[in-house]
């Protein structure tokens, strides 16, 4: 069972916490992570692209010239695909790119990435963010004290407006709650900062 130090927002070690092996200590499964990431990105696509076929563009109702005798190639409509302003042949139409992946796969992908953060020393556990007001500076100071630099994902156990709004104007810092944690953000952000309550909730949800 992996153990990790717990710090306060001043950057001082206050305790340590044991992490459940089945969530924070498994062998990362890259194939499953990739599969779930592709699914996540596909589900973000709007799929609103659209083109008009020759039946939908305006004009072209009559034959532009007679079939024979002009010396020109035969044409049936000035809105056929080969014409300028003609309809598009086999063009994209609105569609949904959404599909589902197995719930076990999604859970395994999250656990793989949490374990990866532990293995690569990219996980920081804080006792709590007890902010009594919304101030960007206090979050900047907390991250500086914790020696967390670069892209950082802060995952909270529950909604905390003071913490979330204190972090939202800091470049390369994002906050999520346990119920919205996802593969994309765990991969995008190098550092993962969580509270002791978050550890408990993750172990409760993913056990």
List where the protein language model places each region:
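Extended polybasic, low-complexity segments that bind anionic RNA or targeting/receptor surfaces
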Residues: 1-46, 91-207
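A short, flexible low-complexity segment enriched in Lys/Arg and Gly/Pro that occurs
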Residues: 30-68
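Glycine/serine-rich anion-binding loops at beta->alpha junctions
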Residues: 54-90
């Amino acid at each position: 069972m992996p153990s990790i130090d717990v710090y306060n927002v001043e950057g001082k070690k206050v305790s340590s916490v044991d992490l459940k092996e089945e969530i924070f200590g498994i062998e990362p499964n890259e194939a499953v992570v990739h599969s779930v990431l592709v699914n996540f990105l596909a589900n973000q696509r709007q799929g609103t692209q659209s083109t008009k076929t020759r039946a939908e563009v305006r004009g072209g109702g009559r034959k532009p010239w007679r079939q024979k005798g002009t010396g020109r190639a035969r044409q049936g409509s000035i809105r056929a695909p080969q014409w300028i302003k003609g309809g598009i042949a086999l063009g994209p139409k609105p569609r949904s790119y959404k599909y589902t992946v197995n719930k076990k796969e999604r859970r395994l992908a999250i656990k793989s990435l949490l374990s990866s953060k532990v293995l690569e020393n990219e996980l920081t556990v804080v006792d709590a963010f007890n902010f009594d007001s919304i101030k960007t500076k206090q979050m900047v100071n907390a991250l500086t004290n914790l020696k967390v630099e670069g892209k950082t994902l802060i995952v909270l156990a529950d909604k905390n407006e003071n913490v979330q709004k204190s972090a939202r104007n800091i470049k390369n810092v994002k906050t999520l709650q346990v119920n919205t944690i996802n593969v994309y953000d765990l991969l995008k952000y190098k550092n993962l900062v969580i509270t002791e309550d978050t550890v408990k909730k993750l172990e409760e949800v993913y056990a």
